[in-house]
Curated annotation (Swiss-Prot):
<dbReference type="GO" id="GO:0016779">
    <property type="term" value="F:nucleotidyltransferase activity"/>
</dbReference>
<keyword id="KW-0520">NAD</keyword>
<feature type="domain" description="Ricin B-type lectin 3">
    <location>
        <begin position="564"/>
        <end position="707"/>
    </location>
</feature>
<dbReference type="GO" id="GO:0006915">
    <property type="term" value="P:apoptotic process"/>
</dbReference>
<dbReference type="InterPro" id="IPR035992">
    <property type="entry name" value="Ricin_B-like_lectins"/>
</dbReference>
<keyword id="KW-0328">Glycosyltransferase</keyword>
<dbReference type="Pfam" id="PF22596">
    <property type="entry name" value="Scabin-like"/>
</dbReference>
<keyword id="KW-0053">Apoptosis</keyword>
<keyword id="KW-0677">Repeat</keyword>
<dbReference type="Pfam" id="PF14200">
    <property type="entry name" value="RicinB_lectin_2"/>
</dbReference>
<dbReference type="GO" id="GO:0030592">
    <property type="term" value="P:DNA ADP-ribosylation"/>
</dbReference>
<protein>
    <recommendedName>
        <fullName>Pierisin</fullName>
        <ecNumber>2.4.2.-</ecNumber>
    </recommendedName>
</protein>
<keyword id="KW-0548">Nucleotidyltransferase</keyword>
<dbReference type="InterPro" id="IPR000772">
    <property type="entry name" value="Ricin_B_lectin"/>
</dbReference>
<dbReference type="InterPro" id="IPR054695">
    <property type="entry name" value="Pierisin-like_dom"/>
</dbReference>
<comment type="similarity">
    <text>Belongs to the pierisin ADP-ribosyltransferase family.</text>
</comment>
<keyword id="KW-0808">Transferase</keyword>
Amino acid sequence: MSNNPPYMTNGIQAAVVEWIRALDLEIISLLLSRAWPLALLTTTELRWRPTVLTDTDNVVRLDRRQRLVRWDRRPPNEIFLEGFVPIVTREDPDWEETDLYGFAKNNHPSIFVSTTKTQRNKKKYVWTPRNANRGIVYQYEIYAPGGVDVNDSFSDASPWPNQMEVAFPGGIQNIYIRSARELHNGRVQRIWINPNFLDPGDLEPIVSSSRTLQVIWRVNHPDGGNKDGRSERSTSSYDDLMYGGTGNVQEDTFGDESNNPKPIADGEFMIESIKDKNSFLDLSKNVNGGIIHSNVYSGGDNQIWVFSYDDNKKAYKIKSYQNSSLYLSWDSNASSKEIILRGYTNSGSNNQYWQIEQTGKNYRLRNLLNLNMIITAQDKSSAFGGKEVIVNTEISNSNTKSSQEWNIIPFDFRPIMDGDYNIFNLDLPNQVVDFSNQPDLLVHGHEFCDNENQTWHFTYNSTYHAYKIWSGRKSNLLLTWDSNATSKEMVVRAYTESRSKNQYWRIEQTGSKSYKLRNLENSNMILGLTNVSTSYGGLNLMVQDDSNGNSNLHSDWDIKPIIYQYVPDGDYNIFNDNFPNIAVDYTNQEGALVHGHNFCSNNNQKWSFVYDGKKKAYKIKSGVNSKLWLTWDSNASSKEMVLRAYTESGNWNQYWRLYQANDGSYIIRNLKEFKMLIALTNIDTPYGGKQLIVTDTKESGNHWYLKKLGEVPLPNRKFRIATKLNYKKVIDSSTAYNLIITHDLNFASSIWELVYDSNKKAYNIYSADINNLGWVYQNKNFFVKLDNIDGPDHGDLRYFWTIEYSMQTGCYLIRSLYDPAHAVGYTDKDSVITDTSTYSDNQLFHFILM
């Protein structure tokens, strides 16, 4: 396997599991590579799907435009809401659950979600499970970034090459799922459209049949929960529909018809000009006879249209969302023979009906009264600020025919679920929307400090199709545009509920983690930060009209769900990132001081994390004395803010919050003061360790890894154990039964069998070549010996070893259970010995499955 860094890829961007999506790509790559099959190490490597790829039809596309399919028995009410969540989601998956080859071959429970590429060769083909025609099955259509290309990764050894699998570590978010076909016993019943889909543009239309109902999904849709008993899934069941051994490639003939009169579903849409990007059909005035033109995007109701298909007329009526009594109409009876569009009340005339014709990826809208007349965008300015739109006969000139082509975009009113969020500015990444309860009720931007001032509770109103955003500081106050303010500065305040539209916000998704917030009172008004400071120490937050595209506000936001319970309650070791062999330690010394100490696997270094749902923080209890809690001595007179183990006081300085970094480590902050975090210094303590402090400065030792105690990192299987620096060098035994490092010559003597003892929570490491022989610890700087470990003294701790995975390196450290301060390593002369653990390269190993 090569050591090349990951190339240009979107990697794990699609992941629905937060902790996986937050990892650096190199870290997740190491996590997946640790279980790579030995036989494939020299010929294959992990291959992420590149950002720009050559599709199965030899067309170069972005990964977001490659059509993927997933077969699943779960309905849209689950998948469109939650996305595809893998069976294994916990933060400490075991070896087997990250085994890509095992997953691809057997689809066992794992952190992966499987998809298959659409295969194109003049016609369209899709890998299809043989039981897809039994019961209720869904074929989901996916356009997602990143993922691992299984065939590219395993080459000729790919278990099921005809499946053309793309596997997604951490699953797939709902915003990357465009549609679903619902099949009952093999027959398509309806097509579900996902309004939350983040369209990358330039996609082929959703393939449909004129006889198939298309439905735009909504939360708890009454028809969106259809499933049969085979859809039930547990952590012990297999992902049966995507198992590569039970399917084959079939031609996808659904929707093959030359003229489909119903190419889109009924629902709410925006109609974008292909000629003038970001210009949409717009009802200029909310009156009967109001002119319809094209105008730049505003997010307003006047640019949203409700499509309803008439089966008798084989055409659509299109009414304004702003005023449901006004229909998109061509006034064909006007004495002036006008050809402009207007919004008229229902007349029953065919000039209010439109046939929609697919033109590749786009659409034409033909008037039913005269099908030669097509809606056409003009260059001429309208009197209302946009450009005129008329009906005209078909244009054949290839340079100008785009004026008759339109993109019909489903409108999504609800891109996020109700809940608590921080609102981070993307241009000023540490600035968030903040309400500090000041006398003028002003809301501003402030440096993130994770308190209730910066918590906002979003609640969706289905009548207004907009959100109310409630203050976490004062739950009766709403984020409000003070639209009646006399000041020219359009400020934002926190007011009690008035039922005014200026307290509602439409959320417009502009990227995978990017949103704009538009006020419902005037959808041209967007929320943004200026660079001007306020008297309260933050930045001015205001709304500004962006209808001319010239807003100078920082108006792009990342609306982040607030997560505090990152790890389950339980016992952990707390290892430092910079000093990987040092753990947080309390040895009951004078002054109850807590420090960092070389790992020795005793109760001094065991800490029980207990989550408090009210305070949304952890208490961390000592493993050596259950009455003592990890405490910041915030009242200490010393300038050095030390950590101590004190009895319970109820004070906030005994509560801690975790903040996950991209590499899987955590920052541990004190609840009493957000800026204060635990850091390890390089200063020695009188007790043989390193000093731990609580500080608000950027110490280098402030990242920590949590190792949950009692978990089994590797299965009871046979392995070769290769060095970190060279996987072709493995642990073997000499004729004197001492362990040595040697080149991998495929000898049976270099195969080792792990047998886990659940009582001792440690392994025996047996020779797979000679019965009863296993590893024996002798002492520091002595050989690891191969000897009989199945005799009367089988329980001797010298025969047992703990194995821990290093997230930083993607390798394993092997410790003696007899003396956990000692780890297996090797010398310059390739002797395998035990020495004080340091996490140095010569103490790190790969376990390669046989």
